A protein has these predicted regions:
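Nucleotidyltransferase catalytic core that binds NTPs
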Residues: 1-194
Length: 194
């Protein structure tokens, strides 16, 4: 089971590509939009209801992908460490993998990765959890920087970010090439990130 957590603020085509690719590696991909985070003010830019609607529009019909909106429904933020226990309880016979970007593990050899330095119980997770590391084009992670139990997920031509999409919307520019049609229609109808 792959846990694909993130703010998905908004969910872009790059997120959908990652989820689709993960279905080739894992039996089930669970998209987990995070709740409000004290360390990420951009998550507060739109309501939880809008984020939930967009995540369901983006991932709802994807084969092998399910959306878990626990954090959004409960108005909480569940740390990765706690997600492990939550999903291990839901799927006691499954091996749980956490999806992260290569930038998050960079510096791992020297214990300087974001997981080591910023995540709750990061050094422990680094040694004990399974990580599926998504490699963006042009961004290579040295083998020594990878977590103890990890698997690389290589994606060619993966471009886009939530920040970029939000900035385009703020500037009144088109996001047609960065989000799926359903999400784009929702963004425009609701006039989000303007």
């Amino acid at each position: 089971v792959a846990i694909f957590g993130g703010s998905f603020n908004p969910p872009g085509l790059h997120h959908q590509r990652i989820a689709a690719e993960l279905t080739r590696y894992f039996d089930r991909v669970i998209v987990v939009p995070c709740g409000l985070r004290p360390d990420k003010a951009s998550v507060d830019e739109v309501t939880i209801e809008h984020r939930k609607a967009m995540v369901n529009l983006a991932f709802g019909g994807m084969s092998g992908v399910v959306v878990d909106t626990h954090d959004l429904d409960q108005g909480v933020y569940t740390r990765t460490y706690d997600l492990q226990a939550m999903f291990q309880d839901k799927f006691p016979n499954a091996v749980i993998w956490h999806v992260v970007g290569g930038d998050i593990v960079s510096g791992g050899r020297a214990e300087l990765s974001e997981i080591h330095t910023r995540w709750y119980r990061g050094p422990e997770m680094w040694q004990e959890f399974n990580f599926a590391v998504v490699m963006r084009p042009g961004y290579q992670v040295e083998a020594g920087d990878m977590p103890a139990c990890s698997q690389s997920v290589e994606l060619d031509h993966l471009f886009g970010s939530g920040t970029m999409i939000r900035n385009l919307l703020k500037e009144g520019q088109s996001v047609t090439e960065w989000v799926c049609p359903k999400v784009e229609a929702y963004l425009l109808e609701q006039q989000l990130y303007r």
